[in-house]
From Swiss-Prot:
Belongs to the VPS54 family. It comes from Caenorhabditis briggsae. The keyword Coiled coil applies. The lineage of its organism: Eukaryota, Metazoa, Ecdysozoa, Nematoda, Chromadorea. Keywords: Coiled coil, Golgi apparatus, Protein transport, Transport. Component of the Golgi-associated retrograde protein (GARP) complex, also called VFT (VPS fifty-three) complex, composed of VPS51, VPS52, VPS53 and VPS54. It holds the Pfam family Vps54. This is Vacuolar protein sorting-associated protein 54. The keyword Repeat does not apply. One of its GO terms (molecular function) is syntaxin binding.
């Protein structure tokens, strides 16, 4: 403490001596910043205001926000900020004019940093003359924060502030689940708790009684011990610090009798007790209010009070005697310490003076010498700058002649920087700045022209083997110069040149392939400016060769663009090595992002995304929300940030341009209807395979970063071509089967060996394929069938047969059913070749099957059946024709129904798992076919039943055996049987006639019963028996009905 006092005195005296050299400071200054580390000292309010504006202020638009406060928030300013004028008023009112603690305002300006730091750490207290070191004590409250400052913290998000009180505990601060009871605590009964309360209650009562008695005894002992020590039992009028007898009211209160005895000033004390009660003499004397008191009694009373006070003072003096003498004895020692302290101070001052002479003065001289050296060095640097600026223009011209654009630009920028900072105002260089700027702009135009010529030369000539970019060094120099000048228009030039380069590569390849394919070019322009029609006249193999060649060349062109892209990225890193983004870059970036969001919606949603197929190239949900490379490069580049964003997309942009050109090539050939009709699914699948292979190569190179394969132009074009082909394929087959049904005569047709081989191949392999594809394996010999047996002809005969054999079962059918099988084979082949469009094929196959079924049933069972075969009414003559037509229709539907499962299996192999539910339509169609076949069988039975019923209605039991009616019935039955034989299988004919026989039995029993013929009528019943036996004999004679079990007449009548 003693050393601190000595240092304090010395520092204060030193600072006082130097304060006379400074100007008069403002009131409350100098002062320090309360929130900056290390500490900064300000001599005036203007300096503090400037500091607050620079370091504790943020600007948002035209508003200023004050950050001079805890946690960077000033609680005296609105959060939304104020204008500039109001902000200046706020600083003056709330920060620069506030009174500050003495510890910060008493630190004087000094050049000695150590002394200034010491003075700022010393505080002179108001109750002591000795200085003390102010230390900030660390307590629990050091962790507290201002709640309003925390809620107004601009670094927190609005969501954090809105959920500040509820994000941890919820809205109610109440636990949602009750706390379970502990298993370690035993459950206590109410009786046990009652006994505890009684025992504890008695103890607590005894404790309270003892505590109360102790407090009372302590109070009484205190009062008795201090009774003579306190002044509370003395009249208050004598202990009042303002007591004076010169005051009339005080004089009257002491020497006169009061009007009310209770208001006597000599009896009023603080404690209510009087140390000197009234004497009996004073009580006996009766005086009127306002008269003087009795002199003798008053004198005695005052003397007694004096004695009491004198005794009490003497007691206190006796009690303080030891302390008093201790102070007296220590005074001499204190004087010695003060003398020693003065000697030490004198020694310290003498030493400090000696140090000042030896060290400080020498240091000042060294500093002055160093300052002079720095000034001269700075002057020499400026002279060197002047010398360099004199040669600036000639140096730039020399660098331009050498083609070193980056160094020339750097020289100009350095010269302009020196002119604006170091040599600002030099008269001899007043025109140099404008001359350099003009030269700067000229260099920019020159570099743009050089870049355009270099790119055109690069894209116009195919590079040598092993190299992708020929003029790499020249391009790097020009690009580095353009990027340092921040002239980004070369991106637009590069974009246009890429588009033209893709076009020229494609045209060159197509012309070469047209000349090599041998297409007749006599009808075309020799220059081949229009390539659409020659491409359409090319053969399919030549066209696929052309497409592959175009894709290979475009892929190589994109690889060259990728090499150019690497050069651009490397140059951009050299030109702008830092990642700084100014406010202007951020604003431009946001504007460009807004443009991108509008252009994406138009660019990505095209007319090609119409496929309902889940496996197609484009689906409805495949629209990419991000901007594509084409969209990004179509925007003008005005910032370094956006340049770095588009540079990695150069190769992808070229790839997207190539996709568009290849898509136009594919669509140009598809515009010719004859070419589309002649295209087979195999040919189309080969084209799709080539496209997918090209897309896979490009995806491996990373050229689908902003746009996937399905959303790309090439994918959409292939999808459109495939969907158009499917529509035309389906329309042609639908029209073909419709024309066949319209012209169908419903007569048995001959089956060619080609169709029979197609069916045999389908039964053998389980896959229905067109007859054109049965040439992959060994050549099959044609079948030659006779009846139900089949033999293989050793020759190459192309003779036809009356029925088609399916799994050892003969089908005699009409020509439209054979055509339908051929069409189904075409569909199966198309499904296997184009599996990604299985969903679209599925819907069209189902539609075709339903159309064939409905048209057949409409023509056979509907109102158009008679007109179709040229009949007006159904009579006995044309009954056989109608019967045969119905039979042929049923067998035709059965034949088509046999091949529906094969189509189902073909579709099952290619449909994805999430689309397997579409196969249920095949089961529905197959069920419809079987229902219609059953309806035809019922129709046949109803026709036979109708004629037998009519004959039985005309039957009369007479003596003619057999009767004419039964002869007619048997004749028609035989005719029906012969009509079915050769068309329907024997088992089906037998089943049909079994149902006819059941109907005949019911009609016969009903008719005989109606005529009243009974077995006891021997004659008539015998005639009936003879007719029925004739019927049995004729039925048994039919080849297909020999196994029928025919009952006797008695069994029919009495069963």
């Amino acid at each position: 403490m003693k050393a601190m006092e000595e240092r304090t005195v010395g520092l204060i005296s030193a600072s006082s001596s130097r304060a006379s050299l400074k100007t008069q400071l403002e009131n409350g200054y100098p002062r320090i910043c309360d929130y900056c580390e290390p500490t900064i000292e300000f001599l005036s309010s203007s300096e503090l205001a400037r500091h607050i504006r620079q370091d504790h202020t943020t600007q948002e638009g035209g508003s200023f926000l004050c950050r001079y406060g805890e946690h960077g928030v000033c609680q005296k300013l609105p959060l939304e900020g104020v204008c500039d004028v109001d902000f200046e008023a706020h600083i003056r009112r709330c920060h620069t004019s506030q009174s500050v603690p003495y510890s910060r305002s008493t630190s004087c300006f000094t050049e000695d940093n150590e002394e200034a730091a010491s003075l700022r750490s010393i505080r002179l207290t108001s109750d002591r003359d000795t200085p003390t070191i102010e230390k900030k004590k660390f307590t629990l409250h050091s962790f507290t924060q201002n709640l309003s400052a925390v809620l107004a913290d601009p670094s927190r998000s609005r969501n954090d502030l809105s959920t500040f009180f509820t994000r941890h505990w919820g809205d109610t601060f109440v636990p949602t689940q009750p706390v379970p009871t502990s298993k370690r605590l035993a459950k206590m009964a109410d009786a046990s708790f009652d006994s505890y309360c009684q025992a504890a209650g008695e103890s607590y009562k005894r404790y309270q009684a003892v505590k109360r008695a102790l407090r009372l005894s302590h109070t009484e002992g205190t009062e008795s011990g201090n009774e003579r020590q306190d002044a509370e039992d003395l009249p208050t009028v004598f202990i009042d610090p303002r007591f004076t007898l010169g005051d009339s009211s005080t004089f009257s209160a002491v020497f006169t009798v009061p009007a009310n005895e209770n208001l006597d000033a000599l009896k009023q004390t603080l404690s209510g007790k009087n140390v000197i009660p009234a004497t009996p003499l004073e009580v006996a004397i009766n005086k009127k209010p306002g008269e003087f008191r009795d002199y003798e009694a008053l004198q005695n009373r005052l003397e007694m009070m004096h004695d009491v006070v004198d005794g009490r003072l003497a007691g206190k003096l006796v009690a303080k005697t030891d302390d008093f003498w201790q102070v007296v004895r220590s005074y001499s020692g204190l004087q010695e310490q003060l003398a020693n302290a003065l000697q030490c101070v004198m020694v310290v001052r003498k030493n400090l003076k000696h140090v000042d002479e030896l060290v400080c003065d020498q240091t000042k001289k060294i500093i002055e010498v160093h300052q002079k050296y720095e000034q001269k060095k700075h002057l020499l640097a400026k002279l060197n700058d002047i010398a360099c600026l004199r040669e600036a223009q000639s140096t730039v011209q020399m660098m331009l002649s050498q083609g070193d654009y980056p160094k020339a630009i750097e020289c100009i920028e350095t010269s302009l920087d020196v002119l604006s900072k170091e040599l600002n105002g030099v008269t001899c260089f007043r025109h140099l700045s404008s001359q350099l700027r003009e030269l700067y702009s000229v260099i920019g135009r020159m570099m743009n022209e050089d870049f355009t010529s270099l790119i055109q030369k690069e894209f116009g000539v195919k590079p040598e083997a092993g190299t992708l970019i020929q003029a790499e060094g020249e391009l790097s120099a020009v690009l580095l110069g353009l990027m340092r000048m921040r002239k980004y228009t070369f991106i637009s030039v590069l974009r246009e040149e890429i588009i033209e380069g893709v076009k020229s590569v494609m045209r060159h390849v197509i012309k070469s392939q047209i000349l090599n394919s041998g297409v007749d070019l006599s009808d075309f322009d020799p220059s081949l400016t229009q390539l659409g029609e020659p491409v359409r006249r090319m053969k399919h193999a030549d066209f696929l060769k052309t497409v592959r060649a175009v894709m290979d060349e475009e892929y190589f062109f994109c690889k060259r663009l990728e090499a150019l892209q690497d050069i651009l990225l490397e140059t951009a890193q050299r030109a702008h090595p830092s990642n700084r983004h100014g406010s202007e870059d951020i604003i431009i970036e946001r504007l460009e992002e807004a443009k991108l969001n509008e252009s994406d919606s138009d660019d990505e949603t095209g007319s090609f995304s119409k496929s309902t197929s889940s496996g197609g190239f484009v689906s409805g949900s495949a629209v990419n929300s991000n901007a594509t490379a084409t969209t990004l490069l179509s925007i003008e580049v005005r910032s370094e940030a956006f340049l770095k964003r588009v540079l990695p997309l150069i190769a992808e942009f070229g790839h997207q341009c190539a996709q568009q050109r290849i898509s136009r090539l594919l669509i140009a050939r598809a515009k010719n209807a004859s070419v589309t009709e002649a295209t087979t699914p195999t040919q189309l699948s080969e084209c799709i395979a080539i496209v997918k292979e090209y897309q896979s190569q490009c995806e491996e190179e990373g050229w689908y970063s902003t746009q996937n394969q399905k959303a790309g132009g090439l994918g959409r074009a292939i999808n459109k071509l495939s969907m158009d082909y499917i529509e035309k394929f389906h329309a042609a087959r639908k029209m073909r089967i419709g024309n066949m049904l319209d012209t169908e005569l419903w007569k048995a047709t001959d089956v060619s060996i080609i169709d029979q081989n197609m069916v045999d191949q389908a039964i053998e392999t389980g896959m229905l394929r067109s007859s054109k594809r049965i040439d992959d394996g060994p050549t099959k010999k044609p079948f030659k069938r006779t009846g139900s047996s089949a033999t293989i002809d050793s020759g190459t005969s192309v003779s036809n047969q009356t029925g088609i054999i399916v799994d050892e079962e003969s089908f005699v059918v009409v020509g439209s059913s054979i055509t339908m099988i051929q069409i189904l084979a075409d569909y199966c082949e198309a499904i296997s070749k184009m599996p990604t469009f299985a969903q679209d094929w599925n819907s069209r196959v189902i539609e075709l099957l339903k159309t064939f079924n409905s048209r057949c049933c409409q023509l056979i069972l509907g109102a158009g059946a008679l007109q179709l075969v040229g009949l007006k009414t159904i009579s006995v003559r044309n009954l056989g024709t109608i019967f045969v037509n119905l039979t042929l229709a049923g067998r035709s539907l059965e034949l088509v129904c046999r091949f529906i499962p094969m189509v189902h299996d073909e579709m099952d192999r290619v449909l994805p798992d999430d689309r397997k539910s579409l196969l249920r339509y095949f089961k529905g169609v197959e069920s419809e076919y079987r229902d219609h076949v059953n309806e035809i069988a019922i129709k046949l039975i109803s026709v036979i039943a109708h004629y037998t019923t009519n004959c039985l209605g005309m039957w009369d039991v007479k003596g003619n055996i057999p009767s004419p009616e039964f002869q007619q019935i048997c004749r028609h039955m035989l005719k029906f049987h012969n009509g079915l034989t050769g068309i329907m299988p024997r088992d089906q004919i037998e089943s049909l006639f079994r149902q006819v026989h059941e109907n005949f039995k019911a009609n016969l029993r009903e008719h005989v019963t109606g005529m009243g013929i009974r077995p006891h009528d021997t004659l008539k019943y015998g005639y009936v028996t003879q007719d029925y036996m004739y019927y049995q004999q004729n039925v048994k004679n039919m080849e297909s009905c020999r196994n029928l079990e025919l009952e006797s007449l008695n069994d029919i009548m009495f069963d």
